[in-house]
Regions:
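Multi-pass membrane proteins that catalyze or facilitate reactions on polyprenyl-/lipid-phosphate substrates
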Residues: 1-266
């Protein structure tokens, strides 16, 4: 891995981590196009953990004041994190074994179909909530503890590579009655405890790999910095986008990317 690859992959991570399109799938595709293989590539594995931290710090920076001002919101995030934390801890090894391009491809396509179906369903069943005039990211203050827990359960689906953490939580957020913007904002926030925990657990479990790759720390820091800047821009742009457009475009995009995987990566 070189500086150019670190920058490109940092951009891909920042662009896709919080969009419902599977950052894992795009990282595999990006690495493939750069001529990098995940098989036996310890440097790439460590790099991907590092740049995830850059992305999650963007959420922390964006919502820091909000979290400090609303302790109840922190409590809801903890409740939402509990299912994922427990299942992730118990099934860590099995989850890692699920990682393969074929699983990612099919998860992308299935997730795309689900997004389109849920969007169309909500237009019929709850048109007021799903209208473009409804909701804002301030809606997260009204989310109940029950809704937080249910959305947290949905986050467990993201342990299947290619499903997309944000995709699964946004879909269930919509089904729980949240607006497009409210579902997205809570999904972003729920990433804080989830991704921090996953990142530090990965570092702990693979500490020997990180120590052996200490010579590449400058690449890890560069990629994380790029991911942070790009993710900060994407978070704001995405909330603005979904206040004007539906999630159907993301569903279609997922299906296309899944098909690309089946044709060119497998």
């Amino acid at each position: 891995m070189d500086i150019f690859s670190a920058i490109i992959l940092g951009i891909i991570e920042g662009l896709t981590e919080f969009l419902p399109v599977s950052s894992t799938g795009h990282m595999i595709l990006g690495a493939h196009l750069l001529g990098l293989s995940h098989e036996g590539n310890d440097t790439l594995k460590c790099f991907e953990v590092a740049i995830q931290l850059g992305s999650i710090l963007a959420v922390a920076a964006m919502f820091f004041k909000r979290l400090i001002a609303e302790p109840s919101l922190i409590a809801k995030l903890i409740i939402g994190f509990v299912p994922t934390g427990l299942i992730g801890l118990l099934l860590y090894k099995h989850i890692k074994e699920l990682f393969s391009p074929s699983v990612v491809a099919y998860a992308l396509i299935i997730g795309g179909v689900v997004f389109i179906a849920v969007e169309l369903l909500m237009r019929r069943k709850n048109p007021e909530k799903i209208s473009f005039e409804a909701g804002s990211h301030d809606e997260i203050a009204t989310i109940s503890y029950k809704q937080a827990f249910i959305i947290g359960l949905a986050q467990c689906l993201a342990m299947i590579p290619g499903t997309s953490r944000s995709g699964s939580t946004i879909v269930v957020g919509l089904l729980c009655g949240l607006s497009r913007t409210g579902a997205a904002a809570f999904s972003f926030l729920l990433a804080l405890p989830t991704m921090f925990a996953a990142t530090f657990y990965d570092v702990f479990k693979n500490r020997e790999l990180f120590i052996s790759n200490s010579d590449n720390i400058y690449l890890f820091l560069l990629g994380a910095a790029v991911a942070f800047v790009v993710a900060l821009f994407v978070l704001r742009a995405f909330l603005s986008f979904i206040s004007k457009f539906s999630y159907i475009s993301f569903g279609v995009y997922r299906i296309i990317i899944g098909a690309v995987f089946l044709l060119f990566v497998l």
